[in-house]
Amino acid sequence: MQQTCIRLVKLDMLSTLTRFRTHSAIRCCAQRLFHCRPSLFISARTYFIKIDSSSLPKLKGSVSFSASCVSLGSSRLGLCSSSFKTGAPAALRAPVVFQRTRGFHTSGRRRALPALPLLWMVLKPLQKIMAIILGRSIRKWWVALPANKKQLFREWSWRRRWHFLGAGTGLLFIASLFFFTHLDESPITGRTRLLVFSRKNFRELAQFNADAFMEEFKDSLIASSDPRHKVVEQVVQILAQRNQDIAEISAVPWTVHVVDSPTMNAFVLPNGEIFVFTGMLNAVTDIHQLTFILGHEMAHALIGHAAEQASLSHVVELLSLVLLTAIWAVCPRDSLAALGHWIQGKLVQFLFDRPFSRKLEAEADQVGLQMAAKACADVRAGPVFWEQMEIFDQLSGQPTMPEWLSTHPSHQNRVRQLDRLIPEALELRARCNCPELPKTDPRVVFNEAVRLVLEGKKEQMLEKEEKNGKTQTGDMFP
C-alpha cells in the first residue's frame, strides 16, 4: 500500500526561536491540513503522519515522500503482547470495530433508559434535601420536648443500648457483604476496586451524553473527509489494532468526532465516542504526542474509570448523608448547620473526590503510555507534552493551582511519573517489533530549546538595560 508522508510545520510565535529547528526543514505541505499558524512552544516543528493515499482527497500543495518518517502504518499493525509474533495477519484475524462519524440528526433514536445509574443521578440531589429535612425535624422535635420527656427518652435509649448495638452490627455486616460482593478487578492493571455500577450500564448512559455533545457541537463538527479528522482516526485505528491484547478494546465501537474549537481538550466517553478539539491538535508537537494523548483518553474508557468514580462517589454520598443528617440535627441554628454542611462538603471533596480523580488520571497516563508504546510511537514525547503545558500556563498568565485543589496531577508531577515509566515503555516498544527510535531524545531537544530561549531573552534584557544606561548617561553629560 502506497503511503504518503505529510509534513506539517508550525512556526513559533517567539521571534527568538525562528531560526531554531527541532525536527526538519521549515515547510508546510498539503495546505490547510492543520492550518499552519503560529504556535506557542518550539520554533519549527514537523509532523510525520502516514496516511493511506487512496483515502485522501486531492490536496493542493506539495506532498513529499520521505524515508525518515517513523513507521506507524499497516505493516506494523500486528498483535503486540509479551509473546509477540511478527506480521499483520494476527491483527487482521481479530478486526477492530471502528465506526466513522454519523450524520447528526436533531431527533435521536429512542432507547430504554439505563435504570440504575440514571436513578442514582436523579435521586442524588434529593437525598441531600431529605437528609436536611430529616435533621431539622429531629432537632425541632427534640427542642419541643419537655424536660421530663427528654429524661425518659434518655433512660429508654440506655435500656435498649444492646438493641442499638446489635442493629449497628447488623448494618455493618450488610455493608461489608455489599462491599465484598461488588469488588472488581481492573481489566488492564489488575487493581482491585469497588464497582457498584457496571461498565455496560455506563456505556448505555454515555450514549445520552454523546447525543447531548453532538447537539452542542453540531455546528462545529469537522467532516470525516477533513484531513484533520483522518489524522485522529488513523491514530485511533493504530492504537486499537496494536493493543489487541486488551480484550475490552475490540468490544468498544470507537467513533471519532473532531470539533473545530480553540479549546485544548480531548475526551472519550465510556461507549467509545471520541471528541478531539482542534485546539488540542494545535497544541501537540507531533504525531507521537497525539498518540499518547489519545491513548490516555482511551485508557479511561477501557479501564472503566467513569463507573469506578461514580461507584466511589455513590458510597461516599451515602456515608455523607448520615453525617449531614447529624449536622442538621445537632447544630442549634440553621446558620451553624449550613456552615457545617459546607465544611462537610469541602472535606469530602478534598479528602476523597479529588485525590481519587488524580489517582485515576495517573493510572490513565501509565496505561496510555503503554498503549502508545505498543503503537510504535515515541513514548519520550509524552513528558514533553506536559512540559509544554507547563510553559503555556506560565506564558498565558494562568494562576498555578496547588495539586491538592485540582482533579488532575500537576504538570511537573506528570512529567516525573512518565519519566520513571519511560524505560519500561521503551522495552515494551522493542518487544513489539517497532522500528528503532532516533538517538536524539525529544526531551533533550525541548530542554535545549527552552535554554536557548531563556538565554536569548536574557541577552536582550541586558542589551536593553545597557542601552538605557548609555541614554541616561548622555542626558546627564551632553
Swiss-Prot record:
Query: Where is the catalytic site?
Result: E297
Which stretches are transmembrane?
163-183
| Disulfide links within the chain | C376-C434
PROSITE patterns per record: ZINC_PROTEASE
- Null mutant: what phenotype? Morpholino knockdown of the protein causes developmental defects, such as pericardial edema, smaller eyes and shorter body length. Bioenergetics defects are observed in dells.
What post-translational modification information does the record give?
Answer: Autocatalytically cleaved in response to mitochondrial depolarization both at the N-terminus and C-terminus to generate the short active form (S-OMA1). The S-OMA1 form is unstable. May form a redox-dependent disulfide bond. Exists in a semi-oxidized state and is activated by prolonged hypoxia.
In terms of Gene3D superfamilies, this protein maps to: Metalloproteases ('zincins'), catalytic domain
Pfam families this protein is in?
Answer: Peptidase_M48
Task: Write the record's keywords in alphabetical order, separated by commas.
Answer: Autocatalytic cleavage, Disulfide bond, Hydrolase, Membrane, Metal-binding, Metalloprotease, Mitochondrion, Mitochondrion inner membrane, Protease, Transit peptide, Transmembrane, Transmembrane helix, Zinc, Zymogen
Record membrane topology = Single-pass membrane protein
Family stated for the protein in its record: Belongs to the peptidase M48 family.
Print the domain comment field: The stress-sensor region regulates proteolysis and activation.
Q: What is this protein called?
A: Metalloendopeptidase OMA1, mitochondrial
